[in-house]
Amino acid sequence: MKMMIPVIFSILLLIFSLSSTAMSLEDEQENMEERAEIDFSGIPEDIIKQIKETNAKPPARFDPAAFEKSDD
């Protein structure tokens, strides 16, 4: 019986983690859809092309390795 409590607690934490991950992925998908629905009337074609190329890229992630000094 003593082992049941930690097992149940672990399962609940896993379920919560998976559901919050799914919700954040859903929010990111909605944000990408909103960026795709921008009204571009009255804007030059070259600027529209640059905006669409930027919006097609995945969101930037911080990479601490990019700031490390190399010993070479």
From Swiss-Prot:
Compartments, record wording: Secreted
Signal peptide positions on this chain: 1-24
Lipid biosynthesis is among the record's keywords: no
GO biological process, one term: regulation of blood pressure
Any one Gene Ontology cellular component term annotated for this protein: extracellular region
Residues carrying the site annotation Important for potentiating BK effects: P58, P59
Domain of life assignment: Eukaryota
GO molecular function per UniProt: toxin activity
Tissue expression summary: Expressed by the venom gland.
Identification of the protein by name: Hypotensin-1
Biological source species: Tityus serrulatus
